[in-house]
UniProtKB/Swiss-Prot annotation:
GO terms for cellular component: cytoplasm. HAMAP family: EF_Ts. Associates with the EF-Tu.GDP complex and induces the exchange of GDP to GTP. It remains bound to the aminoacyl-tRNA.EF-Tu.GTP complex up to the GTP hydrolysis stage on the ribosome. The lineage of its organism: Bacteria, Pseudomonadati, Spirochaetota, Spirochaetia, Spirochaetales. It is found in: Cytoplasm. Its main location: cytoplasm. Keywords: Cytoplasm, Elongation factor, Protein biosynthesis. PROSITE patterns: EF_TS_1. InterPro entries: EF-Ts_dimer_sf, Transl_elong_EFTs/EF1B, Transl_elong_EFTs/EF1B_dimer, Transl_elong_Ts_CS, UBA-like_sf. Pfam families: EF_TS. GO terms for molecular function: translation elongation factor activity. PANTHER family: ELONGATION FACTOR TS (PTHR11741), ELONGATION FACTOR TS, MITOCHONDRIAL (PTHR11741:SF0). Coiled coil: none annotated. This is Elongation factor Ts.
Length: 278
């Protein structure tokens, strides 16, 4: 049976598959349109499985927030061109919305199949790398942020506010948004110095001490220098101790205290997440 170019184009328009693959699928099922769509899915999943071993170092971060939850999702792919593809972006936005609304932090079988179908259509190794879903309490204010046109960085920050009547306060909401921007810019690893593993602190202290051994300085002087270096380093990776993004004369902790005093309610960061491509 001869397959016309019009039939191939119709199948291509519906499925997004390549012209050659559409022709092969139609030939294989004798021109039956519905069977050809099924055949393409089978072909696509097989080819997607073959591509799954290839490096996927590019990608895009997606985020969604509603009244109950906030989420971040990283979908990886092979090229930044695909990360800008409209089908890729639409799929990612839809998937993170589904995950947040369901409260699930893992994919179901249907979603896994949809990932494979997308990979088959785009012809790259595409997979979900990370998912973060966090519940939002009634006294918590959340802001999320995606950086740049390619959304290679995504963050959310969650503030606990003692007086829920202040949740709509402009200065509070501005603070929350600024803190989201801050997390995107400085990528803190911990909320506070107290959250940092004691073994890590000990390793850093030993490293700084070793660096100073050949300095010829006295033990007391070395101890003081090491203490200063350690304090500086820990402050650089702990969010509350970092210089505030819009006023580095204040730490993040001091900026929160400033706004807290101005609106007469206690504010504290209870959660944040930073997610990036690569």
């Amino acid at each position: 049976m001869s397959i016309s170019p019009q039939e191939v184009k119709k199948l291509r328009d519906v499925t997004g598959a390549g012209f050659g693959d559409c022709k092969k699928a139609l030939d294989a099922v004798g021109g039956d349109f519905e069977l050809a769509k099924k055949k393409l899915r089978e072909m696509g999943i097989a080819s997607a499985d073959k591509r799954s071993g290839r490096d996927a170092k590019e990608g895009r971060v997606f985020s969604y927030v509603n009244k109950e939850r906030v989420g971040l999702l990283l979908i990886s792919c092979e090229t930044d061109f695909v990360a800008m593809n409209s089908d890729f972006v639409t799929f990612g936005n839809s998937l993170i919305k589904q995950l947040v609304e369901s409260g699930k932090d893992s994919l179901d079988k249907q979603q896994e199949l949809e990932i494979k179908n997308l990979a088959a259509t785009i012809k790259e190794n595409i997979h979900v790398s990370k998912i973060y879903i966090s519940n939002i309490a009634s006294n918590e204010l959340v802001k999320n942020y995606l950086h740049g046109e390619q959304s290679k960085i995504g963050v959310f920050i969650k503030l606990k506010v003692d007086d829920v009547l202040k949740m709509e306060d402009e200065s509070l909401n501005n603070l929350a948004m600024d803190l989201a921007l801050h997390v995107a810019a400085f990528a803190p690893l911990y909320l506070s110095v107290g959250d940092i593993c004691s073994n890590y602190i000990k390793e850093q202290e030993e490293m700084f001490t070793k660096q100073m051994e050949a300095s010829g300085k006295s033990e007391a002087v070395i101890k003081g220098i090491v203490s200063g270096k350690l304090k500086k380093h820990l402050g650089e990776i702990a969010l509350l101790e970092q210089g505030f993004v819009k006023d580095d004369k204040l730490t993040v902790k001091e900026k929160i205290e400033e706004i807290s005093k101005s609106i007469l309610t206690k504010i504290e960061i209870v959660d944040f997440k930073y997610l990036s491509v690569g």
